[in-house]
Amino acid sequence: FHQRPQQGINDYFWMNHDGQGAGVKNFDIGGVQFDVAAVSQVKSCSPEVMADETNPSRITCTGSSDTGDNGHYALTTKTHNIKAGPIDVEVYANYGFDSKAVDSDARLEAWQGGLVLSHTNDSGVNKVILRYSDNSDNSVYNKTDDLTTVYASFEGSHKFTQQAQVEYLLAFHDYDNGKDNTDNRKNYGAIVRPMYFWNDVHSTWLEAGYQRVDYDQGGDNHGWKLTLSQNIAIGMGPEFRPMLRFYVTGGQVD
């Protein structure tokens, strides 16, 4: 696992650079910390049974990953532990490139920058996430020529009491391919999840979500979803795992 910041309520990795490599984390200079790494994307593999009896397992690979890389590389950086008054600041900058394992006419470069501003108090946390990507979306491994994407979100949580809490998120994603606009779109989303914790074990959640996708070609798409769940966990709070959930979901998409 490497540089995979995730938003919980919409289960989105707004950056993801899992792979093989090396780097340094939390290198401290005057209180500001730096993460730097060079990583390669692992080559995918379809497991097959081989006839060669010299291989005890007789399986080419496990899961969907091989042991080598596929020629897509990333240099990733994160600068954090920055204080701007009551605001915590994180800055991301990543660069993607290809090796000779990729055909010369298919090699591309990509880069992305990200900014996270967060504020924490006794009642909860609020966070703003901004990401700009050139020739990529949420990973500089996966490159598309002349693609520009922007992601912005506001998320947070608030404790009215220890038992009554709410999580919320607003998100925007702009996908703009300058060479092929057939899939160009702007995505708007909103989620709210009020939660009530009856005790350290049982809780009830009601989650409501709405999404609108505005395509350059093909019009708009709207959808909503409502989920009611009864949950069992060891600990009072949405972060405790494992959690056993019993839920019913309803929704509609145009």
Enumerate the predicted regions with their spans.
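Outer-envelope exported proteins of Gram-negative bacteria
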Residues: 35, 169, 205-207, 243-247
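A general structural signal for short secondary-structure junctions and capping/turn motifs
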Residues: 24-25, 118-120, 236
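Detector for outer-membrane/organellar transmembrane beta-barrel domains
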Residues: 80-215, 222-226
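Generic domain-boundary/flexible-linker signal
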Residues: 47, 102, 179, 217, ...
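Predominantly the C-terminal beta-signal and adjacent terminal strand-loop region
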Residues: 220-254
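Outer membrane beta-barrel
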Residues: 1-54, 58-92, 245-253
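Residues that cap or initiate secondary-structure elements
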Residues: 42, 97-99, 136, 236, ...
